Amino acid sequence: MRDDREQHKSITSLSFLKGPPHRPSRLFPLTRQLSWMLTPFLLRTPIGPNQVTALSLLLGLYGAWVFTEGTFEAGVIGSLFILLCYTLDNCDGEVARARGLASKWGARFDDFTDWAVDTAFFLGLGFGVWNVSGEVIWWWLALATAFGATVDYCVDISAYWRESRDDSTKVPDDAKLDRPKMPDLMASLIYVFHTLSRADFCFIVLGLSLFEFTWVLLPLAAVGAQAYWVVDIYKRVRRAGANQ
């Protein structure tokens, strides 16, 4: 995503656009079904892709804060904000590609937003369950999840610094769903589960919130977050060894 000064071009003419996104050919991820309808409206405004990402970040953090209340109403409201956050997380890439404003910096900002919202959500959820139940174990599970997510994010950032990239475009959202060539079955299963659940995680949260069952995410995430960063490092080490 280039500097926002490029956004002074006429928005009404849209002559500089590559075009709005087309209707998704696949049902999943479900968030794409929402984003492709919202993106054309965003393209009629001066809002740039980085601003869409920033709005997604703010909505996600607010939704995470709402979860700290620990009540049924807070869970549903917080879930709706998380849903908006995830929808805009798809929109920013669509806006960037439509306007030809994709960049490495925009991709890194998007990755940061994903990490920040996910980490804040589990911290908010854990605090909320602890607040209502009085059992501190839920807070420790949230901290374990946040730790695992942060380690994995740091591993990715370290890899970005080491690896040189030839193009400056943001990775398309469809590419995020591509399955890596990993011979290890366990690593592959963890990767697929993490990637697909991440794409529509907001719907999982909303569904569980309607039944006051979001607490089940905490023990699952506390274990899964550690497994994913271990697999991520394992995958990168194997790839580095194969390139030598």
Annotated model-derived regions:
Residues 33-34, 39-53:
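Short, contiguous, helix-prone interaction/anchoring segments in small proteins
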Residues 42-44, 96-97, 208-209:
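Helix-capping/transition residues at the boundaries of transmembrane alpha-helices
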Residues 46-105, 122, 141:
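Membrane-embedded alpha-helical segments that form the functional core of polytopic membrane enzymes
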Residues 99-112, 129:
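Short helix/strand-bridging catalytic loops that position acidic/His residues to coordinate divalent metals
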Residues 87, 91, 95, 108, ...:
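Active-site His/Glu-centered metal-binding helix of metallohydrolases
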Residues 2-39, 111-244:
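A feature for the membrane-embedded catalytic helix bundles of lipid/isoprenoid biosynthetic enzymes
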